[in-house]
């Protein structure tokens, strides 16, 4: 398991009973987590003193029950700064377990010692975009949600990257990649964080288990002659990490050589010393 254990502004204090207790800088949140199936005693007083708790409704969805919580605030990870804002469906705009991937891409870009062009797909609020740009890459950030792209721009600004070479694209990811192929554009690195389920602009159904292979195959068509890495994230519990590795072997490594690795992502749990699983990542890298 790749564990994001370098945080200072974020801490997973405890988890159990389908919930997790987190510290985001000075704010304490309780959020649902389907992986935390165990029942453990809630000894930490922050369980009761949390600034906000997300409560699921029996009809689907849910709502935040807030005591004293700012509308938004900032957290830092090393030299990166992000805006955190609790929103619908329990999310905060940041997945802290992704810090292990930010470290990975920053190291690869810095060691490459050449200009690197990165394509970040389903790029959300831009954690990976900011990491790549901070390491010196030119980034194309693509997400279908206009609000998420605006949030990502804000994260870039907070991290001192207002003038960095980042293209901000609001578009369907598959449609954008198809157009880039027609235009003859290539990238040295690709990052993708596709949803488990979604609908395209024409009502096309996206189901990760059925859509991921053809999508990765499509994306391989925009890789340069000397690619640096390809990274796939998945939060779909039905897909083992090794599935991501298998895809990368078939669609990237067989053409370019290099190395494929895969694993679960996790966050260390302060109360128990264990780690909470938070999805999976597959990585292909050349050097």
Question: Where are these predicted regions, by residue range?
Answer:
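Non-catalytic substrate-recognition/targeting regions of SAM-dependent transferases
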Residues: 6-22, 29-96, 103
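Conserved alpha-helix/loop element of class I SAM-dependent methyltransferases that forms part
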Residues: 96-114
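Conserved class I S-adenosyl-L-methionine
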Residues: 113-124
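Short beta->alpha hinge that forms the Motif I/post-I loop of the SAM-binding pocket
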Residues: 123, 143-147, 211
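Conserved SAM-binding loop of SAM-dependent methyltransferases across substrates and taxa
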Residues: 125-139
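S-adenosyl-L-methionine
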Residues: 145-191
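A short glycine-rich, Lys/Arg-flanked "PGG" loop and its adjoining helix->strand segment in the class I
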Residues: 210-226
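C-terminal catalytic and target-recognition region of SAM-dependent MTase-like enzymes
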Residues: 227-287
């Amino acid at each position: 398991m790749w564990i994001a254990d370098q945080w200072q502004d974020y801490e997973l204090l405890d988890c159990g009973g389908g919930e997790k207790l987190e510290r985001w800088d000075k704010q304490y949140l309780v959020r649902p987590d389907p992986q935390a199936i165990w029942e453990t005693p809630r000894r930490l007083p922050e369980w009761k003193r949390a600034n906000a708790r997300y409560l699921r409704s029996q009809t689907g969805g849910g709502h935040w029950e807030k005591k004293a919580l700012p509308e938004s605030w900032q957290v830092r990870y090393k030299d990166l700064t992000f805006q955190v804002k609790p929103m619908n469906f329990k999310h905060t705009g940041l997945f802290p377990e992704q810090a292990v991937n930010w470290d990975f891409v920053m190291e690869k870009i810095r060691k490459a010692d050449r200009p690197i062009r990165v394509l970040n797909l389903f790029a959300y609020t831009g954690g990976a975009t900011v990491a790549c740009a901070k390491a010196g890459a030119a980034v194309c950030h693509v997400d279908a949600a206009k609000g998420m792209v605006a949030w990502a721009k804000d994260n870039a600004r907070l991290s001192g990257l207002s003038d960095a070479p980042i293209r901000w694209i609001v578009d369907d990811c598959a449609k954008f990649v198809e157009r880039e192929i027609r235009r003859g554009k290539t990238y040295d690195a690709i990052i993708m964080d596709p949803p488990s389920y979604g609908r395209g602009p024409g009502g096309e159904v996206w189901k990760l288990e059925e859509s991921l292979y053809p999508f990765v195959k499509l994306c391989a068509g925009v890789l340069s002659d000397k690619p640096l890495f390809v990274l796939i994230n998945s939060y779909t519990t039905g897909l083992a990490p090794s599935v991501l590795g298998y895809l990368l072997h078939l669609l990237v490594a067989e053409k370019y050589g290099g190395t494929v690795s895969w694993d679960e992502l996790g966050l260390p749990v302060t109360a128990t010393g264990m780690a909470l699983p938070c999805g999976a990542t597959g990585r292909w890298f050349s050097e």
